Amino acid sequence: MWRQSRWNEPLITEMSRRGRRGALPPRPDEKVVKEVGPLKLPQSLARGSPPSLPEVSEVEVVRHYTRLSQMAYGVDNGPVPLGSCTMKYNPRVAARLAFDPRLETLHPLQDDETVQGVLEAIYMVQEWLRHITGMDACTVHPAAGSQGELAGVLMIKRFHEMRGDLDKRRVIIVPDSAHGTNPASAAMGGFQVVEVPTGDDGNVDMEALKAAVGGDTAGLMITNPSTLGLFEENILEISRLVHEAGGLLYYDGANLNGIIGRARPGDMEFDIAHVNLHKTFSVPHGGGGPGSGPVCVKRVEVVDGVTLEDLLPGPRVVYSREEGLYRVRPPGRWSVGRLRAWIANTLAVLWAYAYILAMGPQGLRLAGEVSVVNTNYFIRLMEGHWGYSLPYAPSRPRKHEVVLSAKPLKRETGATAEDVAKGLLDAGLYAPTIYFPLIVEEALMIEFTESETKENIEAYAARLKEIAEEARRDPSTPRKWPRNTTSARVDNVRANHPRTVTPTWRVEVLRRQGKLGPLR
């Protein structure tokens, strides 16, 4: 039976003891001091007090982080079928390039002429993504998918602003099966969000969409395949409706892995698309980073020869044919501007560069196809099993992911989707995304990438079936899960409440000092 390590591990700051050191650098040789004189540090560079860093030995640091790793779980431990996250294997061949010491020592302010290799790699990723998505221009500037979304929304805003109709174009339409950050990005951009429902067939309800589209429509944001794992069959008709109304069509690339090499957003007539390098292109992610959300566009004319390409955030890497050099081009007059410091999350871009080179066009297409096969094999394993159902067009094949519902299980036993997730954890299996999308009650959003074996998928399905049977035999059992993990079931309210949530050591210090005021 699986058991996860349970170390009574303190924070590394709590391990600190005054005077303890990991290494003691030698004092400078007296002959050297005599030759060069004493070190004279400008007062403006001197600290007023020592840095607040833990004082620990090297062996304590190594043991501390080793023990923490034993209480964690990631794709190197086993499958992580988090729906809409595409947690695929991170090839070590890509890591060899991304962590090359010659790249780690570069500085973003170096002259372009001295970093031509890195700039070429960034430029090539832009070009490859442009072809993969079927678009005309691309930037790798955004640091995350959500930042790529915001860039797209700001471009839609600038588009209508330059055309002089922003005052009436105040609505962005978002299907209820879209990626979760779409409505947030639209709202951050200053737009009103109008939601359109999903029909029983898993497609956007076209009658509802026709009623929503009008003279106030600035654009539509959609994920295809949707968060249900279904390909939007009416995408060309949706595109026609939005464009005829004067709006722009935005593609959320969160689920690109399900169609890569088979279909392209540009061919679906999208105007703007973002891609997640940390999903489709194998860059490691989780815990907040590193992410990369490149944005690609069609050269749709805005006004007087200005196109959507001119609106892209930056800086961007371009190739100067006259000089035969790659250059960093700062944001131009019409650009929505900088979204972050420097060019991009360069490490993530270089990782994707190595992955795309290693896979090639055929390999990328095969990866998408295998992810689809894995998902549908899992569906077949779960088909008709008591406790779970497949909402929305159960006879339609899914793409990269599937959303099961534990509603029948809850109705009969009281066990919820959260209980199912805890039961998976208790068996050493990573839990899926739960309670999303919101249109599925007791949702279990499961995505097996191309990395997973037939045996891993079968083991996951078998455990889901065991959970249902255990809940039927004794409805109180699921509430006791997990028992074999490092941490037992947490109090979600306390863990997330503004009065108690403590995401960083800095917040912990402020709490101990009583400097965090009451919730207002």
From Swiss-Prot:
<dbReference type="Pfam" id="PF21478">
    <property type="entry name" value="GcvP2_C"/>
</dbReference>
<dbReference type="GO" id="GO:0005829">
    <property type="term" value="C:cytosol"/>
</dbReference>
<dbReference type="GO" id="GO:0016594">
    <property type="term" value="F:glycine binding"/>
</dbReference>
<protein>
    <recommendedName>
        <fullName>Probable glycine dehydrogenase (decarboxylating) subunit 2</fullName>
        <ecNumber>1.4.4.2</ecNumber>
    </recommendedName>
</protein>
<dbReference type="InterPro" id="IPR020581">
    <property type="entry name" value="GDC_P"/>
</dbReference>
<feature type="region of interest" description="Disordered">
    <location>
        <begin position="1"/>
        <end position="29"/>
    </location>
</feature>
<dbReference type="GO" id="GO:0019464">
    <property type="term" value="P:glycine decarboxylation via glycine cleavage system"/>
</dbReference>
<keyword id="KW-0560">Oxidoreductase</keyword>
<feature type="modified residue" description="N6-(pyridoxal phosphate)lysine">
    <location>
        <position position="279"/>
    </location>
</feature>
<dbReference type="GO" id="GO:0004375">
    <property type="term" value="F:glycine dehydrogenase (decarboxylating) activity"/>
</dbReference>
<keyword id="KW-0663">Pyridoxal phosphate</keyword>
<comment type="subunit">
    <text>The glycine cleavage system is composed of four proteins: P, T, L and H. In this organism, the P 'protein' is a heterodimer of two subunits.</text>
</comment>
<dbReference type="InterPro" id="IPR023012">
    <property type="entry name" value="GcvPB"/>
</dbReference>
<dbReference type="GO" id="GO:0030170">
    <property type="term" value="F:pyridoxal phosphate binding"/>
</dbReference>
<comment type="similarity">
    <text>Belongs to the GcvP family. C-terminal subunit subfamily.</text>
</comment>
<dbReference type="InterPro" id="IPR015421">
    <property type="entry name" value="PyrdxlP-dep_Trfase_major"/>
</dbReference>
<comment type="function">
    <text>The glycine cleavage system catalyzes the degradation of glycine. The P protein binds the alpha-amino group of glycine through its pyridoxal phosphate cofactor; CO(2) is released and the remaining methylamine moiety is then transferred to the lipoamide cofactor of the H protein.</text>
</comment>
<dbReference type="InterPro" id="IPR049316">
    <property type="entry name" value="GDC-P_C"/>
</dbReference>
<dbReference type="InterPro" id="IPR015424">
    <property type="entry name" value="PyrdxlP-dep_Trfase"/>
</dbReference>
<dbReference type="InterPro" id="IPR015422">
    <property type="entry name" value="PyrdxlP-dep_Trfase_small"/>
</dbReference>
<dbReference type="GO" id="GO:0005960">
    <property type="term" value="C:glycine cleavage complex"/>
</dbReference>
